[in-house]
Amino acid sequence: MDPYLLMWGLLTFITVPGCQAELCDDDPPKITHATFKAVAYKEGTMLNCECKRGFRRIKSGSPYMLCTGNSSHSSWDNQCQCTSSAARNTTKQVTPQPEEQKERKTTEMQSQMQLADQVSLPGHCREPPPWENEATERIYHFVVGQMVYYQCVQGYRALHRGPAESICKMTHGKTRWTQPQLICTGETEPSQFPGEEEPQASPDGLPESETSRLVTTTDFRIQTEVAATMETFIFTTEYQVAVAGCVFLLISVLLLSGLTWQRRQRKNRRTI
């Protein structure tokens, strides 16, 4: 075998895992009467540039936004732009419907609150800014190590039996999301788990879908600490695996060298 190819394979094998962003194969798990939200997005996360009905992405525009950066600063690359699907009516002024106006105001309010609550994390991007004529639902492509948090929708209360978050992990070469331990029950229904009910802060005056996504500043600090702890643990485990692999290779090389030396000694004795 070519020694250069052997050296390349060896270096590839002992490279510490996690240096390259691995996309998660599936979406985060779904919980009945609950929605999930990412407080910050790891580098490598992609967001589809989706437009609402009657609009389409411009031909020269990128199909997605990408969270990229370095150890000191991360931001979203590319910009999503939507244009009217009807080329003939481009000069016609379209009056937005009341629902669209309400949705736009809600999105702007949500973006402002998120920018105020969020703290910059190394290797993470904030919530992507909204763009004109954006689709109602955002489609993300998360990477390994991403953490999302769950919250019951308006009209339901949370019964916690464990962590209410999910993390995308790499296990045996495959990605999987941990299962969040959250149960949402109607506010009028009796609790089946005494002592496990936890109150939820839901600002009045916001639609159900938007209210369920908001995260308070206090919750964000706690979640940030949990996220940092989990990421440190994941990195430490992967690093230990890499070190163990290096030690194994070193021992193998030493054993092979020893066996080769013994064979040479035996041949020399026979020759003598």
Swiss-Prot record:
Residue ranges constituting the Sushi domain according to the UniProt record: 22-84, 123-186
Main localization (coarse): membrane
Q: Which residues lie on this side of the membrane: Cytoplasmic?
A: 260-272
Q: Where is the signal peptide?
A: 1-21
Cite the SMART domains for this sequence.
Answer: CCP (SM00032)
Q: Where is this region: Disordered?
A: 87-109, 186-213
- Keyword Calcium in record: no
Tell me yes or no: is Transmembrane helix among this UniProt entry's keywords.
yes
Q: Which InterPro entries match?
A: IL-2_rcpt_alpha, Sushi/SCR/CCP_sf, Sushi_SCR_CCP_dom
Sugar-bearing residue positions: N70, N89
- List all disulphide bridges recorded for this chain: C24-C67, C49-C80, C51-C82, C125-C168, C152-C184
Question: Where does this protein reside within or beyond the cell?
Answer: Membrane
Q: Provide the transmembrane region boundaries.
A: 241-259
Task: Provide the GO MF annotations for this entry.
Answer: interleukin-2 binding; interleukin-2 receptor activity
Q: How does it assemble?
A: Non-covalent dimer of an alpha and a beta subunit. IL2R exists in 3 different forms: a high affinity dimer, an intermediate affinity monomer (beta subunit), and a low affinity monomer (alpha subunit). The high and intermediate affinity forms also associate with a gamma subunit.
Record's protein name = Interleukin-2 receptor subunit alpha
What organism does the record attribute this protein to? Macaca mulatta
Lineage, top ranks: Eukaryota, Metazoa, Chordata, Craniata, Vertebrata
Q: Give the encoding gene's name.
A: IL2RA
